[in-house]
Amino acid sequence: MDDLQSQNLSMDMTDSPPTLANNRLENRMAQLITTEAWNINSTDLVKKALVTVPAPSILNPPAESQSGMALKVAATVLQPLCLGESPVVMPIHMQVEGSSAPELNPNGNATYVMTTQGPVQLPVVLEQHVFQHLNSPLVLPQEAPCSSNAIHNNLFQGAEDSEAQPQLLDLRIPSQPQEPALPFEAVLQNLFPTQGSLGPPPCQPPPGYAPVPPQPFNSPLSPLVPPATLLVPYPVIVPLPVPVPIPIPVPVPQSTESKFSPTFPKPPSSFGLHSFKGTQTTLEKDELKPLDILQSKEYFQLSRHTVIKMGSENEALDLSMKSVPWLKAGEASPPVFQEDAALDLSLAAHRKAEAPPETLYNNSGSADIQGHTILEKLSSGMEMPFAPAKCSEASAMMESHSSNSNGTEMVSQPSHPGSELKAENNIEILSESQAAKVIVSVEDAVPAIFCGKIKGLSGVSTKNFSFKREDSVLQGYDINSQGEESLGNAEPLRKPIKNRSIKLKKVNSQEIHMLPIKKQRLATFFPRK
């Protein structure tokens, strides 16, 4: 190296370093990129890097800068470099301790390299992204971060000393014919003609030094689109579960009048308990013994409408209202009714109907034949639709229906003595079916539904089963109402009813055993009998 410096010392004194660099560039412009550049050995490149230093393109006094663009120096940090109108991020890898940042020479006298995109100046020497852009298979090793501390000191002493620049240039000039990678000394000169003074790293990495492989977007020669590996894989949007308010029905407090049945409105006052008792008392005391057909029809209409209204509006209150006429009808005086009120409420488990009032008429009027005839007419009239008929029409229809109903009763229940018992049973059956249509209560209506299933499955006829079921359910009412009567002719009437009820209980139990599947479901209703 001393020989090289001594040979070229006189020429360095006469010619300026940019002039020598331009001469070398013009002489070897055709030989910049040869086959040796692609097949160069990495070890030779490192050895030559210790000698080759791009002095003209990198090291110049700060006074010669023309204030174009500045690059701040930082170690291992990517610094933005404004080139033209678009900022370009260029890697800065080296930093020399205790030295100020020298600046580039923007006068265009740096060396050029011919690439596929035209002549390019190389202010940053041999970065790996340049080779990637030029499709070079050369992989530079990451050795020799800088040549040595002595080289750095010589470089920056030469920047201050007038004789140091020719020395550094002499180091580069003789090795240029042997350096195949030297054409990459000046990059981006033609691409960025408005390049001003740059603050490059104090120690620019030699051609043999390859820093950490920069990302493709760091290079101004690389495509503008970043690689897919640098993009965010996918935006993660996790919808959080938002609690949806669910409306919960809050029961509205009912008034004292309708507290028994919160789902139905209160019944009208015309069908209240008081008015019903007063009407029944008047019918019983005034014209119960003569038992006129007109009075019977009026009472039938009253009881029918009352039952329908109560069944559709207020179920819980319906039980108490229907039980009052029965007990009051079964007894002879109001004080006895006071005692039996509790008994009637206890028997509320049975299915109730408006039959006991008619049974009352039958029992109280059984002394004479006229009472039984009128009762038969009334019972047969209950089979008809609930249209109020005149006295003459009602009597005619009732007589015709009574004969048919009596014949049916004899067939289904041959053990009953007399037409009066048949008429009474017919009244009970019809009133029971009528109450079932109205649905007296939830407690009383459910057994009727299950009994209908049993009736259809067990093979029992509809007529026979309806009679048996109603007689067995109403046996308590028949016995109680008849036992309280003061008439002597009711005794022979009560005994057949009692025997018949016991017999029909057995039949019902047999029918239940015929269906073991339904027996367990009906167990909650029948033990109350």
Curated annotation (Swiss-Prot):
Domain of life: Eukaryota
Induction behaviour: By retinoic acid.
InterPro entries assigned: RAI2/SOBP (IPR026092)
Ranges of Polar residues composition bias in the record: 407-416
Record region (Disordered): 1-21, 400-419
Identification of the protein by name: Retinoic acid-induced protein 2
Taxonomic lineage from the root: Eukaryota, Metazoa, Chordata, Craniata, Vertebrata
